[in-house]
Regions:
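Alpha-helical transmembrane segments of multi-pass membrane transport proteins
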Residues: 1-420
Length: 420
């Protein structure tokens, strides 16, 4: 039964593919394989055809582990702050103002509307870090306009879905907060390391739009002159009015982290207050919006923490079954040394992203590859490794058949937009 840990991992993946909630898949698998692999059933007088691999008493520290590594974790306090900030900004009207202004600013160019979606996606990512909110908001606002001006359905949908996922990599990303906790790296270091790659990714999206506009002009036409109704000083004033609020929030949150003025948790709290001030400035701060924002924040934060509890139980049982030793032995014996390990782990994460969500990969796979990465690359390179993982996880929102950004988009798109 030395490979019982691999059966446990396979059972968890199978439950996730069937559609069971992540927390219950991980926790339920932990309970099942505790019964199979521990001395619990033999202690009740039931004989097993194999020797128990660990004593049930080993799990007595599970409550302490949950409260010590989850409930008392100061870093994870940043999660509800960033979620609150993102949801509140969604309700503040920031996206509407940005899309309208950027559409007028870039509208004279072929592909200008698509470029404006990428720019707004990057600004929303640096302001909110919530992928679902960004994709849905831009799909509701930009997709009808793009289709109206004869943009191809494929380009319109692809640009909106891809730009919305920039919130995965451009800080303040909730994914980076969770990933930093899982690999033992400062969230501030991950934010700093991911900022430039995130902007480069947005730049590559713009280059792709420009390439499509040059090679297939009918797919991305320029806006007609009558649609660009602002020029000169009026356009400049509108651009400044649209850009200053999100840039202020970006500087408030990321600037304080990068320059060491505040921790990510403290910056998240300031960002939450800043989002409320922006909503007040746009006359969108109502009691209903505030209650809705708090409700969504509690729901998403609770989901993350319940998954953490299930992942902690899964990790403890997997380790008790000596799964960590099997993983270490396998990864350390891959051909190519550290580069073979890097290629294999990145390929594995990418392929898993076709079938399971980023949060499942973060809680199931990352904790077991992080110690090997630390051994190969050293602590000074772990932020770099974390950013690579985050970039890879970002693709899980787009890769079919379970790309969540595609389903967010389809949920608000007109019937003419199909997933096939």
């Amino acid at each position: 039964m030395e490979y019982l840990a691999f059966w446990m991992f396979g059972a968890a993946i199978l439950l996730l593919l069937i559609g069971y909630p992540v927390a219950f898949s991980l926790g339920g698998t932990a309970v099942l394989f505790t019964l199979i692999g521990s001395d619990f059933l033999p202690g009740l007088g039931l004989e097993l055809p194999w020797e128990p691999m660990f004593r049930l008493a080993r799990l007595n520290i599970l409550p302490q582990r949950i409260f010590g590594t989850i409930m008392d974790n100061y870093t994870l306090v940043a999660v509800p702050f960033f979620v609150f900030m993102g949801v509140m900004l969604e309700k503040s009207g920031l996206a509407e103002e940005l899309l309208e202004t950027m559409g007028i600013l870039f509208g004279a160019l072929r592909g200008g509307l698509a470029i404006s979606v990428v720019v707004v996606g990057a600004l929303l990512a640096a302001s909110t870090g919530v992928v679902g909110a960004s994709v849905v908001t831009m799909a509701i606002l930009a997709l009808p306009v793009m289709l109206k001006y004869n943009y191809s359905k494929a380009l319109s949908s692809g640009v909106i879905a891809a730009s919305g996922t920039l919130g995965q990599i451009i800080p303040p990303s909730i994914v980076l907060v969770i990933l930093g906790d899982q690999i033992g790296v400062s969230v501030g270091q991950l934010f700093l390391g991911a900022f430039i790659p995130g902007l480069l990714l947005a730049g590559l999206f713009v280059l792709w739009v420009a390439f499509v506009a040059l090679t297939r002009p009918a797919s991305a036409p320029a806006l007609p002159p009558e649609a660009r109704n602002l020029k000169g000083s009026k356009l400049l004033l509108k651009v400044l009015r649209s850009l200053i609020p999100p840039l202020f929030l970006i500087v408030l949150v990321l600037g304080t982290i990068f320059f060491g003025v505040a921790t990510p948790t403290e910056a998240g709290a300031m960002g939450a207050i800043g989002a409320m001030l922006l909503a007040l400035f746009n006359r969108r701060l109502s009691l209903r919006n505030l209650v809705d924002t708090m409700d969504q924040t509690v729901r998403l934060t609770s989901m993350v923490f319940i998954i953490l509890v299930g992942a902690t139980a899964f990790s403890m049982v997997f380790t008790a079954l000596r799964g960590d030793l099997l993983v270490d032995q396998f990864l350390l014996n891959l051909p190519g040394g550290q580069w073979g390990f890097l290629f294999f782990t990145m390929l594995t994460i990418f392929l898993l992203g076709f079938f399971i969500d980023f949060i499942e990969i973060t809680f199931i796979v990352v904790p077991f590859i992080a110690p090997i990465a630390l051994r190969y690359f050293g602590p000074e390179m772990m932020p770099w490794f974390g950013v690579l993982v985050a970039m890879n996880l970002q693709s899980s929102f787009l890769t079919p058949p379970f790309g969540f950004a595609l389903f967010y988009l389809k949920g608000v798109a007109p019937p003419s937009i199909r997933t096939g």
